[in-house]
Structure formats: C-alpha cells, structure tokens
Amino acid sequence: MLFRSTESLVAWDEQVANFGGEIIAARLQALSEFEPIFQEIYRDISSEKPAFITYKSSIEEPTQNPLENSTKILERMKVTRASEIERGLTLTGPHRDDLLLNLGDHLVKGYASHGESWSIALSLKLATYQLLEKDGLKPILILDDVFSELDEERRVHLIKLAKTAQQTFITVAVENDLPKELSGDRFFVKSGQVSKISKSAEVK
C-alpha cells in the first residue's frame, strides 16, 4: 500500500508502537529467564569462554516496560520517517530486532570454532528443554547425531546433562558414537526397517 500523505501513517505507527512495545518487553522477560540457564549449561559443556546472549534492538535501551518501549518506537519512527517512505518498509520495531550469540568478546558467528558452535547449539537446545520443563511441561529431548561432533570432554558433559532428561531420543550414524554410559533401548534403522538391538550388539 502506497501512502501519499504522512498523516495516513499515524494510526499505523501507533499500532506498531503499542504492540511492538509489548513484544519487546515480553522478549526481554523471556530472555532474562532463559539466559542464566543457557549460561550454566554452556559452562558445564565448555568452560573455555563465557557465553551470553545480547538483544539487539532498533530502539535504544529497550526495557521490560511495554509503555517505555512504545514511546521509543514512536520517537524513532519520526527520525526514520523519510527513509521508511523512500524504502517502502518499517525500519523500527520488534521485526527489526535480533538475538546475538556472544562467546567472550566476540560474536559466535564468524568466530567460534566448530566444537564451540556445536556446544552453543546444544546449550540453546538444552536450555529450551529445561525452561519448558520449569514451566510444568514434559518435553522430549532429541539429540540428532551430536556426539560425533564433540570432543571427549564435551561428550562427558553432555552425557551428564542428557541423563537428567525424563525422555531422550538420540540418533547416531555409527553405533560407536553412542556413549556406553547411556542406558535405554537401542534400535537399528536401515532401508526403512527398524530392529531392536542390545547395548553391546555391533551394527554392520
């Protein structure tokens, strides 16, 4: 839709600001609960560098107060009005925000090693699992061929964390990648056929 008058945008700006302020506040609230769990898990998996999450916003100093965020969105929209009209898109609001993963003083993207990236990804998954569990849900933990990507130290830490889950599904391409410390039923899948195997059985 092409607006020929900036006056037509006022009502839309208010809607974006009101709902946007609430969304940003809710995200920050969720992040305040999620990040400590994520950091603790990452420390258990890899203690080399501290990991943390930064909320990158299109407004300055977003808070958990929806009204404050809405006011800042409206103020920012006034500044970017000409650019928005020229480009045909809204440059301020929660749709422009992002979460940045940090490892020490660097962004994970473009800096973290393969092992560190896997540790970060696992920490995010496990933190999500624990947060859902904390809210009274009973999630299932699914780990898809992760042990082959980790060094021995990280494998040991992940095994300890996996044991705390009520129900876990783990897939591996090679049976030896599945740690012997983990108990439970094991199945071999080939060409769409599923067969149960013993813990000590060798898959050929």
Task: Tell what function each PLM region has.
Residues 185-187:
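Conserved short hydrophobic beta-strand within the ABC ATPase nucleotide-binding domain
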Residues 6-140, 149, 153, 157-160, ...:
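Conserved NTPase motor "head" modules and their coupling/switch loops across ABC/AAA+ ATPases, GTPases
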Residues 144-146:
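Walker B catalytic acidic pair
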Residues 167-173:
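Structural recognition of the conserved hydrophobic beta-strand(s) that form the central parallel beta-sheet
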